[in-house]
Amino acid sequence: MELGLSWIFLLAILKGVQCEVQLVESGGGLVQPGRSLRLSCAASGFTFDDYAMHWVRQAPGKGLEWVSGISWNSGSIGYADSVKGRFTISRDNAKNSLYLQMNSLRAEDTALYYCAKD
């Protein structure tokens, strides 16, 4: 009986680790106004192409602001008015990755950028 409980406990731990959602952003930096940056987000722990994905940001001292979103198959894409025409969201389902190409950067784009799943 004691051995059986140990195995159940071990399986529960392994299942929890396997299902842990991880979203790891990269590509940020310090650039002059007018320049470009490309952000990447590597996803794991879930079936990436089952979900719409989003970029949100938080400027210093402010709340979260939605920046852009993309459907699972890239068929539907949306942007906040503040970035429309300058930012481009894309995804590569084969690589479980989300991207944000940011052009013509402005001082007001200074923020922490996060990717998020639906």
UniProtKB/Swiss-Prot annotation:
Residues 1-19 form the signal peptide. Residues 45-52 are annotated as: Complementarity-determining-1. Residues 53-69 are annotated as: Framework-2. It is found in: Secreted; Cell membrane. Keywords: Adaptive immunity, Cell membrane, Disulfide bond, Immunity, Immunoglobulin, Immunoglobulin domain, Membrane, Secreted, Signal. Residues 20-118 form the Ig-like domain. This is Immunoglobulin heavy variable 3-9. It comes from Homo sapiens (Human).
